Amino acid sequence: MEFFNVGKIVNTQGLQGEMRVLSVSDFADERYRKGSQLALFDEKDHFYSEVEIASHRRQKNFDIIKFKGMNHINDIEKFKGFTLKVSQQHLSDLDEGEFYYHQIIGLEVYENDVYIGTIKEILQPGANDVWVVKRQGKKDLLLPFIPPVVLNVDVEANRVDVAIMEGLDDED
C-alpha cells in the first residue's frame, strides 16, 4: 500500500492529548476531519500504527489534532517527531484542474517548449500555492499557481507548461 505525507508531529499541545502538526497536506481540513484515518510512521519511516482523528483546529502555523482514545499528554508524547501519512485508499477524487501535491512534485516545467526545471516543492504562503522549480545552474524559480502563469498541467505526460511573467525570474 502506498502512503503520502500529511504532516509531522512537532510537539504536544497542553495536557489533554493534543499535538502540534506542521502540515504538508494539500487538503488539511479533509485530512484532519473528525473520523479521518491516518497512519503514523516513526523517525526512521517505519509504519507504527493507524490512528483516527478525534478533533482538529488551526493555531498560527500549526494544525492542532487529537487522536481518538488518547486523552492525555502521556498517551501521545512518544509521537513527537513522527510523520502522519494518508494511504492511497483514503484519497478522495478531485475535480478537474485540482491535483494532489505528490502528483505535481517531480513534474518537468516548460516555457514555449524550452525545459526550465523540475518542481521540487510546493509552498503555501497565502491565497495561492507557489511551486518551487529546481533549475540547472540557477537559483530556484518560484511560480505562483495562477492561470496566467500555469497554462497546462499534464500529470500523465509529466509536464507543466508555464508563461513566466515579467519579474518572476530575477536571473533574466
UniProtKB/Swiss-Prot annotation:
Which residues are in the PRC barrel domain?
95-168
Highest taxon of the lineage: Bacteria
**Which compartments does it reside in?**
Cytoplasm
Q: Name one GO cellular component term.
A: ribosome
Provide the coiled-coil residue spans. none
A Gene Ontology annotation in the biological process aspect, one of them, is:
rRNA processing
Instruction: Give the UniProt family note.
Output: Belongs to the RimM family.
Cite the PANTHER family for this sequence: RIBOSOME MATURATION FACTOR RIMM
Q: Can you quote the domain comment?
A: The PRC barrel domain binds ribosomal protein uS19.
Subunit annotation:
Binds ribosomal protein uS19.
Q: What is this protein called?
A: Ribosome maturation factor RimM
Species for this entry: Streptococcus uberis (strain ATCC BAA-854 / 0140J)
